[in-house]
Amino acid sequence: MPMDIETKQSGDLIFRSKLPDIYIPKHLPLHSYCFENLSEFNSRPCLIDGANDRIYTYAEVELTSRKVAVGLNKLGIQQKDTIMILLPNCPEFVFAFIGASYLGAISTMANPLFTPAEVVKQAKASSAKIVITQACFAGKVKDYAIENDLKVICVDSAPEGCVHFSELIQSDEHEIPDVKIQPDDVVALPYSSGTTGLPKGVMLTHKGLVTSVAQQVDGENANLYMHSDDVLMCVLPLFHIYSLNSVLLCALRVGAAILIMQKFDIAQFLELIPKHKVTIGPFVPPIVLAIAKSPLVHNYDLSSVRTVMSGAAPLGKELEDAVRAKFPNAKLGQGYGMTEAGPVLAMCLAFAKEPFDIKSGACGTVVRNAEMKIVDPDTGCSLPRNQPGEICIRGDQIMKGYLNDPEATARTIEKEGWLHTGDIGFIDDDDELFIVDRLKELIKYKGFQVAPAELEALLINHPDISDAAVVPMIDEQAGEVPVAFVVRSNGSTITEDEVKDFISKQVIFYKRIKRVFFVETVPKSPSGKILRKDLRARLAAGISN
């Protein structure tokens, strides 16, 4: 059954899910929604700490989160105040985030590997009143904390001037203040990656996150089918919205167990899957690539995994096929999201309770209770099937706006509620969405459009190439030409000419790579997106091969 296409008065062609709309309890605060069915799985595992195998039950997680809420309140945090969570994946991240939600407070999440300047910039921009971190990162905010009366809480050892997280947990959960949380109140403030400009605070509301989680896991035929016997691998950083939403919040809603890894290590990762019988693996392309290329995979039994989903960046067909062979019982597919969209716009219907057939390379179909359209970037007119254009989404799941930036908000969200993603894609005859590339990342060769993602998919399919990124280089005659940054596989001596020849045999003339630069690593954001602006900056500075 195809998505419904409605012709609006404006002439827009609007795409909707193959799945019927569902009731979503948008009046509930996020924590109430996540724990709505708590009595059904009180004693079941909620969090499993991969570092030490400690298990926290659902009852323990809910109780500890309420204690943390009281502890934060005693330190002065009130409704609509902001806390900063500067942590790698750990149970305390979960307690802090849910605890803040109970207070009607806001969590802004930051990468603990940020420089001190980056951390302070986000703390200042978000008006954070407390930072929750580890002792090894506390120094990054020390001076700013002293100057601005900012309290620093450490989850391990507490250096001088810091509060230990255990003090929060000692609070009496019955002393939680009575707050009236509105559906449109902000609960999470992630900062968008900044790959197309300066990082901006993305205001995600209780209603927005409840809607997004429900679009994935609620309903008789859930789009992303999960249940209380599932174990999700949480290796993606919780400070990124993909992991926070599609791993943590979705799992909490259905009563599944969440296996927490602080960071990705292929050997430990492969060891934990059979040890804890992991059933669902939410990954990003760099992890998928590591699995596909690792010789260690054959030493482990990965048969428990029934779902492998990839998001944050497009995954090529060849990489999909390579990983499919590693997980014998898993359905493999992609989702598509962006922070501003809450984040999920599309999800693979092979993951549904009653699955649909899908095509390799597609990144799903639009989620239910939402609308999608494809527009011409130049004219703004909506486009029919199979024509690439900018992807736009509308629904209760999208952000409220950018914090203190009404101009950027107005540029991103139209008055009619359409959020412009800046991504180029098309919807085919079977209602599946295909991402072509980022609008701003398209290379223009004499007016022809060259999509870096297409060339990258070809490059990493070469056995002597372990990773690659393609960016534009200014050219006097052509305007821009594609150049590649390539990471050689171990022991490889592949040359620039060999790489160029490999690509030229597979693409039209204007897509041929003009230069190849060999590098140790391709710079990427925590979510796995290639940091093209860093590579363009190296070109501008006159990189030498």
Swiss-Prot record:
The residues listed in the UniProt record as binding ATP, with positions renumbered to this chain, are: 192-196, 200, 334-335, 339, 423, 438, 529
Tagged with keyword Membrane:
no
Give the binding site residues for CoA: 263, 446-447
**EC number(s) reported in the record:** 6.2.1.12
Q: Does the keyword Acyltransferase apply?
A: no
State the UniProt keywords alphabetically.
ATP-binding, Ligase, Magnesium, Nucleotide-binding, Phenylpropanoid metabolism
Please cite one Gene Ontology biological process associated with this protein: phenylpropanoid metabolic process
Give a GO molecular function annotation for the protein. Answer: CoA-ligase activity
The entry's (E)-4-coumaroyl-AMP-binding residues are: 242, 246, 312, 334-335, 339, 347, 440, 444
SBD1: annotated segments: 265-334
Q: Where is this region: SBD2?
A: 335-402
Q: What catalytic activity does the UniProt entry give for this protein?
A: (E)-4-coumarate + ATP + CoA = (E)-4-coumaroyl-CoA + AMP + diphosphate; (E)-4-coumarate + ATP + H(+) = (E)-4-coumaroyl-AMP + diphosphate; (E)-4-coumaroyl-AMP + CoA = (E)-4-coumaroyl-CoA + AMP + H(+)
Q: Which Pfam families match?
A: AMP-binding, AMP-binding_C
UniProt pathway annotation: Phytoalexin biosynthesis; 3,4',5-trihydroxystilbene biosynthesis; 3,4',5-trihydroxystilbene from trans-4-coumarate: step 1/2
Tell me where the transmembrane regions lie: none
* Cofactor requirements of the protein: Mg(2+)
- Cite the domain annotation text: Both substrate-binding domains (SBD1 and SBD2) are involved in the substrate recognition, and are sufficient to confer the substrate specificity.
Q: Which PANTHER family match?
A: 4-COUMARATE--COA LIGASE 1, LONG-CHAIN-FATTY-ACID--COA LIGASE
Family indicated by similarity: Belongs to the ATP-dependent AMP-binding enzyme family.
Main role? Carboxylate--CoA ligase that may use 4-coumarate as substrate. Follows a two-step reaction mechanism, wherein the carboxylate substrate first undergoes adenylation by ATP, followed by a thioesterification in the presence of CoA to yield the final CoA thioester.
Report what the protein is called: 4-coumarate--CoA ligase 2
Upper lineage is: Eukaryota, Viridiplantae, Streptophyta, Embryophyta, Tracheophyta
Which gene is annotated as encoding this protein in its UniProt record? 4CL2
